[in-house]
Amino acid sequence: MLGGIIGGLTGNKNARLKGSLVLMRKNALDINDFGATVIDGISEFLGRGVTCQLVSSSLVDPNNGNRGRVGTEASLEQWLTSLPSLTTGESKFGVTFEWEVEKMGIPGAIIVKNNHAAEFFLKTITLDNVPGHGAVVFVANSWIYPASKYRYNRVFFSNDTSLPSKMPAALKPYRDDELRNLRGDDQQGPYQEHDRVYRYDVYNDLGEPDSGNPRPVLGGSPDRPYPRRGRTGRKPTKTDPTAESRLSLLENIYVPRDERFGHLKMADFLGYSIKALVDGIVPAIRTYVDLTPGEFDSFKDILKLYEGGLKLPSIPALEELRKRFPLQLVKDLIPAGGDYLLKLPMPHVIREDKKAWMTDDEFAREILAGVNPMVIARLTEFPPRSRLDPARYGDQTSTITAAHVERGLEGLTVQQAIDGNLLYVVDHHDHFMPYLLDINSLDDNFIYATRTLLFLRGDGTLAPLAIELSLPHLQDDGLITARSTVYTPAARGGTGAGAVEWWVWQLAKAYVNVNDYCWHQLISHWLNTHAVMEPFVIATNRQLSVAHPVHKLLLPHYRDTMTINALARQTLINGGGIFEMTVFPRKHALAMSSAFYKDWSFADQALPDDLVKRGVAVPDPASPYKVRLLIEDYPYANDGLAVWHAIEQWATEYLAIYYPNDGVLQGDAELQAWWKEVREVGHGDIKDATWWPEMKTVAELVKACATIIWIGSALHAAVNFGQYPYAGYLPNRPSVSRRPMPEPGTKEYDELARDPEKVFVRTITKQMQAIVGISLLEILSKHSSDEVYLGQRDTPEWTSDAKALEAFKRFGARLTEIESRVVAMNKDPHRKNRVGPTNFPYTLLYPNTSDLKGDAAGLSARGIPNSISI
């Protein structure tokens, strides 16, 4: 049988084309055991179940609008079971086409019809040997629903790459039709599961006004600008016509069907896991907390989460939930009957040493090599100044003085340290001060706005010099001023006041980390990766054909993003969702992120530009990456610049194949429509910003594509996969502070002297919030077993262009070299920021391109997936 397929031709050599089709049945994604091979039900695809028609790329049919000639329908034949290239759940079939090349030309597209009652996932169709041309591959990677669900034919192009002007005339109408279908501008919704419509909407589905839990609409107004999300077309709420109605937890929010996981991916499981957490485990935790004192008393109490687990009481909701979830893996999350044992893995930051996180060295190291290493900036004026409007906030210049810091400057004056590029700041003061009156009026909240000054020592490490904690003060005249206190490092040891002051300093660092945790989750992570990326996904599908070179370049970096963002709107960032439950701004959180989006700049997302803007690097044409780091041992920047450079080289080489000059780019109608829509619609609330590239030069396109790839891959990896390893241990990165700093002469200060650990853990995130938040971080921080990493593609036949394939191979080789470089730097004892007191090496930007077996699955804290995937 295989010989006949591979030989490819029988009978009249020019009248028949043989090939094969690879698909996955719907229930292949619902199997209980991901390792199982599903072989039942294959026969349903044989006969007339699935039909295919070839479309000519070279000869037109004058009776069909001069479209490419369409061949007769061909049905699937043999089920080819023995080919080792098939992965779990895939089925491969033979197919024979009646097609005479002399009369019909070279096939360039194929029409596929599903005559079943259920959908299937079509991966590829391959023609083995087209006379005079060789093999032709059609890459689909698309769900095919029954033909009755569509108003149009499902058409797939060969894997040739074509600018609109180079598309064969016979195929151009099909290309235009496909984009029109995906835009769906004439379809208002509500969209159904099978729909493929990519349209925009504002964030108006986070609240539930009908239940008395509204949230402001984000996007579409100067006051609350926001990136757009994918439209669902759901009906408005009854009480607020501007708000979209919400779905129950077990219903899936609409995203275009091919954006929903079409692969055997842990993300399906993770999606269910999050829903299980929200709907079942959270109530169980709440019940547990109600039945116990509900507080941690010591670090030892917190360690029990990892060493022994917590026995949660059995509640009926858990058993009901267990029945409703399909996957066995999720059923295992929710055991039947008895107590539910919640046991979490030991976070990396305390695996080697349970106390090293408390050192100033580790606190400072995580600013450069932690989960939020993109906030630190060089201090250029002393004391630090606020940029808040003085008409509303008065003068909020920092109260840190030279006397506070000079003992830690290794003999230098403040000015000498500034002139030597040795003073740095993590400045969250302006980020939070405008919101603290509202935030601190919420129960169990006592949040400071913080500034942290750091000194770059001779050995390349940072030392914290001072922490300023500020609270807002509303004056009679309406002015909101700051009341600030400055804290400086205290040595451990001793008795009496000295011992207490060391704990005061530990609390000061905790208040800083509370600020940083929120900024990381809300801005560095959600806004600056997830939210800003979705408009690019939508615009690419609406305006760039799958045959367009830029579509082929960017597609891997969009995988799962819309689905994950929809899941976030449903369970994480919605009103009353896990984010509001566990992070201090609570109901104000997403509205705050809208205010910060006003200052977001696409141009600043390119890593070299970001580093220069923060003053931690300076332009340097002689440096390999055109910038020179002022903090030489800055793991995020060291690894990030190498990865950025590899991405930029790849984009440069790839795009040069299709755009030999700026004129070709300017004449590319699809590309120009794409960029116009990104700017004017997807990010329309900031369309007038002067930093937007005009997209008139190939250099602008290279930079834009490199930036999009960077955001979806490396930037997201840097802020996502270290969440549990660093913040899974609550005291290291708490999400809330509940009490003010104890002052000398108060009973709170005396309590700190008596039982400092108890005061510390009672000051930070309470037990209920902590367990829920940490449980979520564990889910979000895992790599899936079938992760596709930077420098890999899930479909080897993604293009027929040999030059593009060679450039991609070089890209992968560069990334593999970076892996070796990261390993070597982590072993270099002179690079003290790479590993630090916790003995936890920085590998978040280790590309993992060389891993073809899924070795980095789970909580590995290493690897850069192509896209924003949990």
Curated annotation (Swiss-Prot):
Q: Which UniProt keywords apply?
A: Cytoplasm, Dioxygenase, Fatty acid biosynthesis, Fatty acid metabolism, Iron, Lipid biosynthesis, Lipid metabolism, Metal-binding, Oxidoreductase, Oxylipin biosynthesis
Instruction: List, for all copies, the residue spans of the domain called PLAT.
Output: 32-158
Q: Which GO terms describe its biological process?
A: fatty acid biosynthetic process; lipid oxidation; oxylipin biosynthetic process; response to other organism; response to wounding
List the CDD domains hit by this protein, alphabetically: PLAT_LH2
> What single Pfam family name could you report for this chain, choosing any that match?
Lipoxygenase
EC number, UniProt record: 1.13.11.58
Q: Name one GO cellular component term.
A: cytoplasm
The record's remark on the cofactor is: Binds 1 Fe cation per subunit. Iron is tightly bound.
**Which pathway, metabolic or otherwise, does it act in?**
Lipid metabolism; oxylipin biosynthesis
Please state where this protein is localized. Answer: Cytoplasm
Cofactor(s) needed for function: Fe cation
From the UniProt record, list the reaction(s) this protein catalyses.
(9Z,12Z)-octadecadienoate + O2 = (9S)-hydroperoxy-(10E,12Z)-octadecadienoate
What's the subunit arrangement here? Monomer.
Family membership: Belongs to the lipoxygenase family.
Please give the function described in this protein's UniProt entry: Plant lipoxygenase may be involved in a number of diverse aspects of plant physiology including growth and development, pest resistance, and senescence or responses to wounding. Catalyzes the hydroperoxidation of lipids containing a cis,cis-1,4-pentadiene structure.
What's the protein called, per UniProt? Linoleate 9S-lipoxygenase 2
Which organism does this sequence originate in? Oryza sativa subsp. japonica
